[in-house]
């Protein structure tokens, strides 16, 4: 590499230093914002349950398996500057829901012969799963270009979960034929969230934005073999209204 080429590279590097330093100290000048997003929550989780009940003076067993699927989410929220120019405190509410099919297998005692169980299977549709979540965030807002800001956030999440499961079985003889009604279970659990929000100003007080966020929690569902994972990776877009 020639001396002239090295000098050019060094000069370019020295010119870039002040610009980089300036970018590191750029101040976010607004007071806060209100946000609305629509997007998709990606990922699915298995839910397996087992339960027993008394029938013909013996014990019957019923097991179910279903896949809690991903779905569309909506979000309302906001944030307000709490320290310096760049740190905001935020809160948002998200809702997502989905339906699933449930595969049911049961071991049903014989009404006449003792200790001669019969295997029965069935399939149900329309098992509902929904998650309402409140996300509390510390957000670091940083202007990165003209009209373009990036917010990095993290904090705890409170999940309010509703889940349809199989908890009982109705047996009709002869056959047997079975009916497995769905029962709604409600649980509240705590998890966390972390994400990035990109905002581009189209007006002085209005921005369009995109969000990528990971949320996680786990809930104890009655009869479930393991805790059910809630949340997932969320990606969406929406609008922001800025407070000056």
Can you annotate each of these PLM segments?
Residues 1-30, 244:
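Cleavable N-terminal export/targeting peptides
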Residues 23-85, 240-244:
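Short glycine/proline- and aromatic-enriched beta-strand/turn motifs that initiate or cap beta-hairpins
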Residues 25-26, 66-82, 86-96, 126-143:
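Outer-membrane beta-barrel transmembrane strands
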Residues 27-37, 71-75, 86-90, 131-133, ...:
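Outer-membrane beta-barrel architecture
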Residues 29, 83-85, 143-147, 201-205, ...:
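Outer-membrane beta-barrel channels and translocator barrels
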Residues 36-40, 74-80, 91, 136-140, ...:
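Residues on the lipid-exposed face of transmembrane beta-strands in outer-membrane beta-barrel proteins
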Residues 43-70, 94-134, 159-189, 217-234:
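Extracellular/periplasm-exposed beta-strand and loop segments of Gram-negative cell-envelope proteins
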Residues 202-218:
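Short cationic/low-complexity microdomains
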């Amino acid at each position: 590499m020639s001396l002239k080429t090295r000098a050019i590279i060094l000069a370019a590097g020295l010119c870039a230093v002040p610009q980089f330093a300036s970018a590191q100290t750029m101040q976010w000048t607004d007071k806060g914002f209100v946000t609305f997003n629509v997007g998709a929550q990606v990922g699915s989780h298995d839910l397996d349950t087992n339960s027993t009940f008394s029938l013909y003076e013996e014990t019957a067993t019923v097991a179910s398996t279903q896949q809690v699927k991903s779905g569309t989410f909506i979000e309302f929220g906001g944030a307000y500057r709490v320290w310096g120019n760049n740190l905001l405190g935020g809160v948002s509410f998200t809702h997502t829901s989905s339906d699933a099919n449930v595969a049911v297998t049961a071991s049903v005692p014989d009404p006449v012969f003792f200790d001669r169980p019969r295997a029965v299977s069935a399939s149900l549709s329309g098992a509902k799963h929904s998650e309402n979540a409140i996300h509390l965030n510390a957000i670091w807002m940083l202007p990165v270009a003209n009209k373009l800001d990036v917010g990095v956030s993290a904090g705890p999440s409170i999940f309010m979960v509703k889940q349809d499961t199989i908890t009982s079985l109705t047996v009709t003889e002869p056959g047997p034929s079975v009916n497995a009604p769905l029962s709604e279970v409600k649980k509240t659990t705590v998890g966390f969230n972390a994400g990035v929000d990109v905002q581009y100003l189209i007006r002085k007080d209005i921005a369009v934005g995109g969000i990528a966020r990971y949320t996680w929690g786990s809930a104890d569902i009655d009869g479930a073999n393991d805790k059910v994972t809630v949340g997932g990776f969320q990606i969406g877009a929406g609008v922001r209204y800025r407070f000056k």
